[in-house]
Amino acid sequence: FVFGNHDCEMGAACNKEQLAEIFATGKYAVFTKGRYEHSPQNPITGVGNFVVDLTDDQGKLLLPLILLDSNMYGDGWFFSGFDRIHEDQTDWCMEKLNERKVPAMAFFHMPPAEFKEAYEKMKLGDHSVIYEHGSIGEKDEYFGISNQPPHFFEKAVDNGWLKWIFCGHDHLNTLSLIYQGIRMTYGMSIDYLGYSGIAKQYIQRGATLITRKTNGNIDITMVPLTTVVSTRVRGA
């Protein structure tokens, strides 16, 4: 689980710190606040920055999963636009990658600006971008990116260990592509309330299946809701 930009908006009963405490109480929860990596006096930005290491039965590290809080809005709240992964979070992430030196995945809510950059290049026929699956379904090919200077993706490219990025945020986007050695993927959506009229839209609805094979290869596939709902469930 990672936080998005709506979890603690005006009128919310809990802030992220309080929600994190609730989520961490689950019997099988692996979620943690991830705030005090350096010290309680100087916590890194956001709530829920942590790593889940997938290992084999001998304890060998197979795949690190890095979860990050991409935060909510800038200092002016809604009027300042979307926030982003902050520099201290980026530095922390690169530290964790360097400690492990194993190809890793990152999960966070809001897409990096380079996702839009790659899409625009792909439309112009730039072969440095490799299309994998999905589409941009948002009106006017919208990407809900921050207006703050980007840095996370560039640092990840320079680092070399982050190979897969997964995000959400833009409910109708399902695009997956490879750019500068990193595969960026929008997860499919399951909401029926996010946008006006979204309950009647279906192309974006479903799940994203991530499979790590025994040889280390990763498969990422769309699982539309129509493929998992039987005719009996639909009442046919």
Which ranges hold each PLM region?
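Structural recognition of the beta-strand scaffold that forms the well-ordered cores
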Residues: 1-3, 8-10, 51, 64-68, ...
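Extended active-site neighborhood of metal-dependent phosphoesterases/phosphodiesterases
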Residues: 1-100, 192, 205-211
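Active-site environment of divalent metal-dependent phosphoester hydrolases
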Residues: 3-13, 73-76, 110-117, 150-153, ...
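Short aromatic-enriched loop/helix-cap "lid" or pocket-rim segments at secondary-structure transitions
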Residues: 11-16, 116-121, 198, 233-235
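Short, electropositive alpha-helical surface patch
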Residues: 17-29, 123-127, 174-188
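Short linear motifs in intrinsically disordered
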Residues: 38-43, 164-166, 198-201
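Binuclear metal-dependent phosphoesterase catalytic core
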Residues: 51-59, 152-159, 171-236
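His/acidic metal-ligating clusters that form di-metal
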Residues: 64-67, 79-170
